[in-house]
Amino acid sequence: EEIVTKYGKPGEKQHMRCPVHLSIGQEAAAVGACTHLTRNDRIFSTHRCHAHYLAKGGDVRRMVLELHGKLGGCLDGRGGSMHLMDDSVGAVASVPIVSSSIPLAVGSALADKLDANQNVSFAFFGDASMEEGVFHESANFAAVQQLVGGHFI
């Protein structure tokens, strides 16, 4: 997160074209969650996705370019801070809407089950997500379908 914070100091000209939601102090959780995931495993994140993206193998240079809205960013500057994605490393989606990463991860886990592979789909979300119906619906569906996946709050 030091890369990001050096561009957002109060009173200085802002270099980023988009809101940046940091997760300072939470990087170790992302690393721990992603350590044993493979490139074929997929993560679905929130608006605080920087650590998840990097822990899954995302490129630092492409992340910084994305934060600045530049070509060469992980989405060629179109996604910004809250939408870091790189399918080649399994960082499939970063969704800023509360709880929205959860059903995507469950759908991905269902696709893996139907394809009979051993991939894992992993959703990161905040505690407020558990107040949303989609959290409970997704958890119920995943249990009934016996899907392989993980959730990290």
Feature locations, PLM:
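Cofactor-binding active-site loop characterized by glycine-rich and histidine/acidic residues
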Residues: 2-5, 9-145
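A short, conserved beta-to-alpha structural element at the edge of catalytic cores
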Residues: 145-153
